[in-house]
């Protein structure tokens, strides 16, 4: 709470999950899937102890997803369906979750780097007009990640459910001209894993079994350090084979798919996406930065988001960066490689890093009136109020 007794809410709206809670807390109060579902047919009124309503949101929608037509209001970090997004926010602020009177609260929201201004304007409009928050702030996710890590300068590799961003931040300011995005993230890896399991002969349905396969992915997938070696092991031995019990009791065996699915992050052509993978993109981003800042960036690479949680990802990233640096900068001169310092930080709680950074920032700023856009300012200026964030509004 701030000095006037107003609650300060932090809401990190991801493509796949909403993480929400209060300023100063060190963990989100609620984490739930960012989905909205509508029943395909109205046959039963209840399943187990969940009542089927015309509109199901979050956890309930996730549990009954096989009976619903499911929509994700956000795609690749950007809101695509505003009506459904409002349902999601109603659920977040309503009795099911935070249970707050929005008129007496301030809210800190997060957005991906390179977010279209229109998207941000609309978010602010909804927050003030529909929910009547007393103050609103919109922070860039990569900057929050660095705050949570206690840094002001670094490169954030943020890979969530819908989009992967590589975002250099210098002295607390994100550098949009250097920010790169890769439209491969958790959801695409899950889809690819479904495809690989289908090739193995297991019948998975792309929508009904999506959650099941996501769980398999989270439990068993990893990033291979040396891909040729992993493929050899997969072909010639059974050391990689793990059993997994599905919710209905069937047991499946998963082998080479464990590293083949996340490999798409490093080799996008595997899932028919053009462009370079995450390691090369990171290398290109740092090399495009000012020569004086490059060394700082190489020493402060911070991973963030659920799709960076694969075992083996940090070491593979480091290996590829060193390889690229050796080939392209040192032109193969191995002697000089020992001077090349690189550090990849993989904090254990990186799944919720953006929320944690937001909770820290909102707590520090809760009583600083010139930080927040206020309802009064919005009534006077409309969306021009965003100029307070240092955003030019045409």
UniProtKB/Swiss-Prot annotation:
Subcellular location: Cytoplasm, Cytoskeleton; Cell projection; Nucleus
SUPFAM superfamilies recorded: Actin-like ATPase domain (SSF53067)
Residues holding ATP: 160-162, 214-218, 305-310
Coarse class of the protein's main subcellular location: cytoplasm
Cross-referenced PROSITE patterns: ACTINS_ACT_LIKE
Complex formation: Component of the Arp2/3 complex composed of actr2/arp2, actr3/arp3, arpc1 (arpc1a or arpc1b), arpc2, arpc3, arpc4 and arpc5.
Cited function: ATP-binding component of the Arp2/3 complex, a multiprotein complex that mediates actin polymerization upon stimulation by nucleation-promoting factor (NPF). The Arp2/3 complex mediates the formation of branched actin networks in the cytoplasm, providing the force for cell motility. Seems to contact the pointed end of the daughter actin filament. In addition to its role in the cytoplasmic cytoskeleton, the Arp2/3 complex also promotes actin polymerization in the nucleus, thereby regulating gene transcription and repair of damaged DNA.
Name of the featured protein: Actin-related protein 2-A
The organism of origin for this protein: Xenopus laevis (African clawed frog)
Taxonomic lineage of the native organism: Eukaryota, Metazoa, Chordata, Craniata, Vertebrata
């Amino acid at each position: 709470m701030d000095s006037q007794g107003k609650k300060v809410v932090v809401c990190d709206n991801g493509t796949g999950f909403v993480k929400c809670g209060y300023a100063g807390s060190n963990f989100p109060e609620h984490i739930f899937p960012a989905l909205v579902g509508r029943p395909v047919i109205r046959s039963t009124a209840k399943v187990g102890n969940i009542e089927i309503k015309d509109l199901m949101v979050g956890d309930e929608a996730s549990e009954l997803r096989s009976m619903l037509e499911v929509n994700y209001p956000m795609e690749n970090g950007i809101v695509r369906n505003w009506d459904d997004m409002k349902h999601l926010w109603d659920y977040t602020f309503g009795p099911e979750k935070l249970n707050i009177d929005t008129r007496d609260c301030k809210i800190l929201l997060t957005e991906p780097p390179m977010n279209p201004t229109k998207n941000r304007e609309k978010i602010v409009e909804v927050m003030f007009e529909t929910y009547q928050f007393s103050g609103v702030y919109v922070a860039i996710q990569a900057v929050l990640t660095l705050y949570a890590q206690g840094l002001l300068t670094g490169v954030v590799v943020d890979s969530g459910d819908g989009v992967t961003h590589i975002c250099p931040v210098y002295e607390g300011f994100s550098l949009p001209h250097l920010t790169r995005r890769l439209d491969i993230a958790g959801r695409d890896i899950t889809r690819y894993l479904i495809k690989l399991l289908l090739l193995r002969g297991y019948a998975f349905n792309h929508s009904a079994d999506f959650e099941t396969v996501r769980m398999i992915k989270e439990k068993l997938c990893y990033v291979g350090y040396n891909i040729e070696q992993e493929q050899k092991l997969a072909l010639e031995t059974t050391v990689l084979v793990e059993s997994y019990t599905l919710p209905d009791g069937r047991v499946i065996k998963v082998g080479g798919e464990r590293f083949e699915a996340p490999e798409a992050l490093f080799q996008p052509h595997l899932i028919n996406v053009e462009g370079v993978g995450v390691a090369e993109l990171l290398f290109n981003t740092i090399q495009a930065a000012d020569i004086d800042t490059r060394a700082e960036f190489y020493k402060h690479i911070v991973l963030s988001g659920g799709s960076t949680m694969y075992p083996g990802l940090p070491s593979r990233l480091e290996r590829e960066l060193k390889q690229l640096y050796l080939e392209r900068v040192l032109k193969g001169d191995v002697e000089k490689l020992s001077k090349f310092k690189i550090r990849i930080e993989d904090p254990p709680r990186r799944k919720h890093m953006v929320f944690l950074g937001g909770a820290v920032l909102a707590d520090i700023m809760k009583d600083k009136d010139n930080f927040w856009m206020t309802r009064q300012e919005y009534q006077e200026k409309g969306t021009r109020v965003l100029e307070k964030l240092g955003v030019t509004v045409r």
